[in-house]
């Protein structure tokens, strides 16, 4: 059995039989930013292995690092996709989604405050995580008792203040002024 990284975002597990023939290959790819999702990468790699080693059982298991694609990985494992209207990183309305598995919500910050949503407007003084808080509030209102929050792929630098505000927190100065 051999395990190791091929690249920073792709791991593999290879098993050979007694004759040294490749019997099973498990491919564990993350996404390739801006080009392939982890599912697309896994499917492509699986096909390539099967073309080169037809006797090999190749299995792709998509993974994510908490950014884009995290929710999709849970959806592939049977979670339900839940959509909600939220505020985007620059105040625009948008529909974001999270995964629900029993009473657990898996929310990726990228769905409400991700880099692709910035569309070139990289302005850390204006970008907010408010929509992420709205997703958390939606999940809680729908009965989720646990929240898993993936923090990758954000276009914000508000330290979660927008998220906390959406959940009811108030931020005051020394004079109790908002």
Walk through the language-model features, giving the residues of each:
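Short glycine/serine/threonine-rich phosphate/pyrophosphate-binding segments
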Residues: 30, 70, 132, 155-160
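N-terminal amphipathic/hydrophobic targeting modules at extreme N-termini
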Residues: 1-11
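Conserved small/polar residues in nucleotide/adenosyl-binding loops
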Residues: 177-178
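Glycine-rich nucleotide/cofactor/substrate-binding loop typically near the N-terminus or early
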Residues: 47-119
